Amino acid sequence: MLLETCWEALERSRIDPTTLRASHTGVYMGAISQDYGPSMGEATEGLEGYLVTGGAASVISGRVAYTLGLEGPAVTVDTACSSSLVSLHLACQALRQQECSLALAGGVTVMADPGIFVEFSRQRGLAADGRCKAFSAAADGTGWAEGAGVLVLERLSDARRNGRRILGLVRGGAVNQDGASNGITAPNGPSQERVIRQALEAAGLEPAEVDAVEAHGTGTTLGDPIEAQALLSTYGRGRSTDSPLRVGTVKSNIGHSGAAAGVAGVIKMVEALRHRTLPRSLHIDEPSPHVDWSDGTVRLLRESEPWPRTERPARAAVSSFGISGTNAHVLLEEADSDDAVWGEPSEEGAAASAVALPEVPWLLSGHGREALRDQARGLYEWLGDAPEIEPADVGLSLAVTRARFEHRAAVVGRDRRELLEGLDALASGELASNVVRGTAAGDRHPVVLLLTGQGSQRAGMGGELYDAFPAFAAAFDEVRAHIDPLLDRPLGEVVFAPEGSLEAESLDRTGYTQPALFAFEVAMCRLLRQWGVVPSYLLGHSIGEVAAAHVAGVLSLPDACALVAARGRLMDALPEGGAMVALQAPEEAVTASLSGRDGVGIAAVNGPRATVVSGDHAPVAEVARHWRDQGVRVSELRVSHAFHSYRMDPMLKEFQRVAEGLTWHAPEIPVVSNVTGEVLTAQEATDPEYWVRQVREAVRFGDGVRWLRENGVGTLMEVGPHAVLASMAMECLAETDTSTGVVALQHGDHPETRTLVTGLAEAHSRGVDLDWASLFPTAERVDLPTYPFQRQHYWLTGQPRTSGATVPEARPDTDTETTEPEPPLDLSGMGPAEREEAVLDLVLRHTARVLGYSGPEEVEENRGFMDTGMDSLAGVRLRTSLSQATGLELSTTAAFDYPTPATLAGHITQRLDGAASTEADPSLSGLDRLESALESGSLGEAARERLRERLNALLTRLDATQPDPKGADLDNATDDELLDLIDKEFGIS
């Protein structure tokens, strides 16, 4: 309950809770020890090790801090009924003393056991009807309530600087104790008066400057008169009759919530200040006759009334008095009218773009598909009741004030109607053209930008983006300023010419095609950079690699423009002719088919079965005919020249002369080479000869994609004017990889802004981070529904406890029967894919069992074990369970070394494959022993260093063509001799 309330409090403060991880945020929570669950001496298997941390009130604040990753003070306060108000006071002190930068303060009460009802009934402290009739003649005891309340606190200066919506101010407060009074549980009037005066002094206020008091007001015949007299003595005297102190208590509305009572009163008064209304207290048909109400100017709020207007800020006080004698009093003040609204649009966002986003994305996420749908449904209903909220404000608020979980979706629309239709489809699980869905990987993976080559150009490309996004326009204009003097006509006249015009036809001339693509892609990369897309790699195709080189910092913009203009001009000046053909066949087979044919060669290897040949018409036609006869798909490319063939040779010398006149730099962002299919080295990038080879040699795009896949990239984003490379990349990945995503940010003649925003939303759904605030420069933050938690109860079930009885395990509210232990894992006869799937299923089942989930379907394979709530004890149990199921000796830290079910399953599969190899070759068993020792952490640093030296020596001998005698002795050693040697050398037992 408290975790959810803390999360919701942060969301309502427009703070994404995940952004507070590792921050100096404090947690101050009031909580009273509760009796739910067995005692420590009664625990059985399944509960031992969790009773203290799971049942002790002292752990509550720490658990909040642990779950959210907060590193400020975490303090649980138990002063009985005053716990949460004392927590608020301590949190304010910590903020003033710089112990934390933000604080969560509040309290929680859950009465899971009837003991407190029985005890107070024996003391005649409970009202017969369960209602608190505070300060009423009918008062006959208190009435209990349960719940939680949390406040988000920040220093006023920080809150203003961070653009927070400020709901109210804490002017000051005080805490004291009754001391040796007339009974530890009896209220003490003088102590209450002292704490009120101390709080007023701390706040720098006079009693008459406070308009109302939220009283402790429990409804008891002893406590109410004492508290009323304290209020009369402190606040009631010296006031004019037209400015009485208004007194009320929220306990008459909701009951006495124990440790959460104080924060309930604060929440009530903050809302009262915001709405400038003093709410009535219930059940006061007649004021208590045990109080001399004429002793001061005090008025009970028997009816709601407007907050009195004065020339000073409205103020209220809140009292909370613990049964143990700890008293707290806090002074509140209304927020300044300028602070009580959401912050203005950020200067950074406003400077980055002068116009609003033409297409609005609404981003949603959840820990599961049901949560995602529930969030869409809740938002749809919420907005149905709030037609005044602007779509862009919703978009900004979703993007920057809500956490981003694994299951993601985005709704894209130009207006409110279209966006709501998409929300409705998402909530219903239906497909819609403006809804994208995806699952973000548990770990963040690198992003790659793909820069397209010739063939992707189209008339008017970038025109809509130019008008919509000033950053794109500025970058495009900057390129034009450098490249126009090098062209026969201004680039803009060609690129933005109406389709079908003579100028537009020039776009297909190489001399203009290459500069146009360069300008478009540089502008796109600049726009993406503004929106927070920072690529880990760049991969271009032909001229796209030159654009990538500039984006990576290899060439300045003037030098890059000079190279691009020369490249296009020199190619365009070559005699027209030649041909290019795309074949749906592997490179090796195509190479073989070229044997004996002159004037034709491979121009590009775009995938495992995507090869392009280029050269003279006749031999190219022969090759095409050969492959058609074999039933292979053949596509003739519409080109003016046979690029990447010997027909480019006449331009190379002049092109090299231009390249040698430029200044080259090592890449700041890794560029994957078209020539080698691997990352471009600094030596290659700065060598003009490389860029000459890049013109002439085959484009090894498929090899580049394979290299990226092998190096763990997550998402490939194509930034060209048409989706060309995206489809090639998908073909490269289709057979071997389902984890890498491909996104095209433009699709030919589709609306450019719509396609771009949808592409960004799709990338986001795959886990790509963007600075979404920069996409909403004019929007403001608004209230939205909080996260739809998917609650499931795990009650302790069983018969009432007797001496010696066993403790029932915590089980979910399902009808699932207890299952028998499953047989050991048997992978015999399975292929590699089946083995991986079987092991993953095993890990998911055992994880669900250890965590108490109802089934493996509740476990996300790419979600971190830590995020599921797994602690070290559960991690060891998972390791033990999986070791028994697989027969492997897994490390006790396996769940943390391999932090997701998917990575742990991959490790186990690899170990099982190694075990199978060991059965086939027993000499490898010694290595298995060594691997287990390394994983267990039993080797000291000295032993590890000796191990490195010894293994390096072994590898040297293994690679040697003639093993030396010592190596031969080692090769001939038996398993036992090898193990004895390892044991003796490294102390492995």
Predicted regions and their residues:
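Condensing-enzyme catalytic core of the thiolase-fold
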Residues: 1-352, 374, 381, 505, ...
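Short, low-complexity connector segments at domain boundaries
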Residues: 7-26, 370-371, 377-464, 525-526, ...
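Helix-rich "cap/lid" substructures immediately adjacent to catalytic or cofactor-binding pockets
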Residues: 58-61, 438-539, 543, 613, ...
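Acyltransferase
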Residues: 172-173, 177-183, 421-422, 497-719, ...
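Flexible catalytic loop/linker elements that gate and position reactive groups at enzyme active sites
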Residues: 187-202, 315-447, 463, 573-581, ...
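Acyltransferase loading domain of fatty acid and polyketide assembly lines
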Residues: 206-207, 252, 284-287, 316-318, ...
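Flexible, low-complexity segments
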Residues: 308, 479, 516-538, 583-584, ...
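Flexible, low-complexity inter-domain linkers and amphipathic docking helices that mediate domain-domain
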Residues: 390-393, 416, 682, 787-989
